[in-house]
Amino acid sequence: MTLARFALALLFGVLPEVVGFESVLNDSLHHRHRHSPPPGLLYPHYLPTEQRHRRTRPPPPLPRFPRPPRALPALRPHALQAGHTPEPHPRGCPAGEPWVSVTDFGAPCLRWAEVPPSLERSSPAGWAQLRGQRHNFCRSPDGAGRPWCFYGDARGKVDWGYCDCRHGSVRLRGSKNEFEGTVEVYANGVWGTVCSSHWDDSDASVICHQLQLGGKGIAKQTPFSGLGLIPVYWSNVRCRGDEENILLCEKDIWQGGVCPQKMAAAVMCSFSHGPAFPIIRLVGGSSVHEGRVELYHAGQWGTICDDQWDDADAEVICRQLSLSGIAKAWHQAYFGEGSGPVMLDEVRCTGNELSIEQCPKSSWGEHNCGHKEDAGVSCTPLTDGVIRLAGGKGSHEGRLEVYYSGQWGTVCDDGWTELNTYVVCRQLGFKYGKQASANHFEESAGPIWLDDVSCSGKETRFLQCSRRQWGRHDCSHREDVGIACYPGSEGHRLSLGFPVRLMDGENKKEGRVEVFINGQWGTICDDGWTDKDAAVICRQLGYKGPARARTMAYFGEGKGPIHVDNVKCTGNERSLADCIKQDIGRHNCRHSEDAGVICDYFGKKASGNSNKESLSSVCGLRLLHRRQKRIIGGKNSLRGGWPWQVSLRLKSSHRDGRLLCGATLLSSCWVLTAAHCFKRYGNSTRNYAVRVGDYHTLVPEEFEEEIGVQEIVIHREYRPDSSDYDIALVRLQGPEEQCARFNSHVLPACLPLWRERPQKTASNCYITGWGDTGQAYSRTLQQAAIHLLPKRFCEERYKGRFTGRMLCAGNLHEHKHVDSCQGDSGGPLMCERPGESWVVYGVTSWGYGCGVKDSPGVYTKVSAFVPWIKSVTKL
């Protein structure tokens, strides 16, 4: 087998390349684990001496200025098969290969902006376009020679060297579009492929990331039978998924034989947020985390004009590319000018979107820009040494913080100078700035990382300044450095960080707060949740009115992770991200503590005398029931949707008395309930209180009011050992008709006519209360549709216990088990008179079990007791 492989390779002239490449890989992997050389290409200086000298040529002595390298003859292609001829050395490095930043003998390239001025003064004309560029990609400015770059030699001097831009490149072949195909790797002048053993989505994602075709790859396989004769370089590739190129992944050198199932590795590149979002990439930066923004639309790549471009737009781009960290917008073709069409203009993201497609913007292709206005972004990863300004009104001002060892910390102002400020602002993309008192910004609770910082003003990075060791200082947070950088004419909006949304509210201005982090929507725990936190959420969503916080899963329990706990906003922040003081995902909560907000909240409006009189003269009005259509059947009701619903509670000095029964408000001072509610604790008025206007039993609300009990009247025919005559009236404390104050959330129900038969006159019936939901008793007021049934159903089921003073109601369908358990004992069964008002026809009384098939609920028939009710209440 070995002899056959050797003969076959010799026949096609590929033996030196394939064998040499395996030697490079083996040697590179060996040194990578022992000496950890810089990541990147397989550096030839790790080869044996004779191989290194045979394959490379040492650079010439450093001239007074770098000469543009001469073009070398193209290497003779080794034909593997028809249609598979390796390409000669390219004259430039394509945008799809941004990781090529070393010479062909392994020296890392310098950034073009870091070339000493002494060389720049005498530079060739063809090189002028590269001055000031922040990237270090190999280039051929005159277009005639092999790509080259500057590098620093062992003596600290600047030299130049050629690059092989194809070495280590990848491409996708065998598909009709550029987003999928068989993976091929270029090495030693020959394109080869990868065995599909252990090939998964993490490996595929690295390929897609390397080709700038999206942040998510799907692993595929291709039969070798359709590839022809092509070398196999690797098997068992084991990427984590966050590597910048496939060379940095662990893998095995192919030792020959047959790949499992005779399949080669292939990929399909896509985006994690779905095909509706445009495909984007970053081009021209020094790494995959920055560059000119380009979009793929209508079959071609194009750029974005920088009109209105700011950090909020950059936040969305970074999120769509699945790049975390600090997002920053760049203007005026900072990463070089593009060459395709200008696709978009006037992009105005809030920073809360998941894709640029969701942002306000011009129509595709409409603009008034040239490529000198191409927009760029940087998505700076949170690595040691990253800086930010926090606690201010925008990203241009605040307390200086440095990221180190997984935590943000501050800088002490001992010896702080204007040069230090200049270096910080320049690194953050501003031209200049000034020191500001840290007292103007919220005090940090984190560590103090740096002290005695001294910059010369020439540094490009803050950490290049002299300083003490990390964590060594003699300061307090009163000495934290504060800085205000000048945004200039371009303007900079604060990056809004994590997207937020409101869920399960009655309208778009309220709901459970959910935040999008790490690709998943999750909730916020209500520990310490206040109106100040709510104000920041509403501001981030664009609402300017008053905000109110809601706790205890006021809008229902969410699903998924609880992302954030112990939010501490001052109320002045622009986004939730500025208020998070605790690690993401760290909490001690359940979803029963999910936080919510109400935006543009204008509270309880005072009613004039004329309005009070009009409300007291009518009954059965639901002023809020038409605000939104809801699915009825054991679901949360609308706040204020059942304004006559009240609760009978055990009296407590802490206003947390236990709910005993539901009840129905008949007037300002009289409440209707069930007699059995007083069996356990007696009829002493000192034991009870009535709460009106309530919705969430654990959250104090603006319309609710707790009123003492003045009198309890139980029907004289009621016996504790019987369910007949199960009706009672409660007189509230207060002057006549001035006990409960009427408003949109507190109104009386209507009484039926004496001996009225609701089965013939009523429709659209509901029960309400804080009753059994199937798992526990509800914290929020529930409502469920229910049907009035012929009395024979209950007479057959309950025999002699069912009397003519009772109503039979429920749902007999197997999939609709709604009965009296969904309401509360003593609570109302309400029906609507067609074209008129709402009438209390029943009082929740008794039944056999909860939600049991063929066991309808039994309700006291109010129409049978109208004379008694009127005689007691004088209504």
Swiss-Prot record:
- Site annotation Reactive bond homolog: residues: R630, I631
Active site (record annotation)? H676 (charge relay system), D726 (charge relay system), S825 (charge relay system)
> Where's the Peptidase S1 domain?
631-874
GO BP, one annotated term = exocytosis
Domain (Kringle) ranges: 93-165
Q: Which UniProt keywords apply?
A: Disulfide bond, Glycoprotein, Hydrolase, Kringle, Protease, Repeat, Secreted, Serine protease, Signal
- Secretion signal: which residues? 1-20
Spans traversing the lipid bilayer: none
Name which cysteines form disulfide bonds. C93-C165, C109-C149, C138-C163, C195-C259, C208-C269, C239-C249, C305-C369, C318-C379, C349-C359, C412-C475, C425-C485, C455-C465, C525-C589, C538-C599, C569-C579, C619-C750, C661-C677, C765-C831, C794-C808, C821-C850
> Record's superkingdom?
Eukaryota
PANTHER family (UniProt xref): EGG PEPTIDE SPERACT RECEPTOR, SCAVENGER RECEPTOR DOMAIN-CONTAINING
Tell me which family the UniProt entry assigns to this protein: Belongs to the peptidase S1 family.
What's this protein's function? Plays a role in neuronal plasticity and the proteolytic action may subserve structural reorganizations associated with learning and memory operations.
Q: Can you name this protein?
A: Neurotrypsin
